[in-house]
Amino acid sequence: KKYNYNIQVGDVITGIIFSKEKQGYLVDIGTPIAAYLPKEEISIFIQKQTDIEVNLAQEFFILAQDLQKNTIILSTKRLLYIRSWTRIRQLNTEDIVIQAKITGINKGGLLVELENIQGFIPKSHLCYITKVDTLLNTTIMCKCLIANEQSNQLILSNRAAVLEKYLHKLKVGTIVDSTVIALKSYGAFVSIYNIPALLHISEIEVNKTNNFIIGQIIAVQIIHIDIKQGRLSVSRRYLKK
């Protein structure tokens, strides 16, 4: 029995794939005409299957319809996209630490996948990692920085996640041991729990960095914590000689 549903573009509807065509699939959604699921609108998860299961009920997104031409176009890719962004918005709102899969590495940072959406961790938001190339296809802890569904922009921070993990040990005024990881004209970068921290030249007791060497362990005092950006600033000016 067929039902004359009053369907609209943007609706989510249950249907059953009943026939494989050259460029897609025919789907029974209870309307007098069969709906069509083009191959390019099939979600990534289903594409990974060698054969799409027929006669299995599942949900579809109404992508387009033209009743004069008797066509209803469906999408599972769009449905997955909408639901993925709903979960990402929730993760962003709750500001929780999450695990993302690393899918690519470039000079600017890491490409990751979170809830089937591609995201990016800029190099400036990565903790100190010596062998970045070994990270491909592993997971990395991070927090959302920018989550914009309209522009499909997902920017994440590994530093912010690691900083939150060790926040109970890192307070303004705390003196900790750190490792020198880079020397710059404006100061030095040190690693604290693998979180890069800036030791500005004005915060060094003799206003110069040439008495430091890479790998040296030095005591520093935390003077600023930016939890959202995952940044630390440290000083040696107030340490007892």
Where are these regions (language model features)?
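Single-stranded RNA-binding regions, centering on S1/OB-family and related RNA-binding modules
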Residues: 1-241
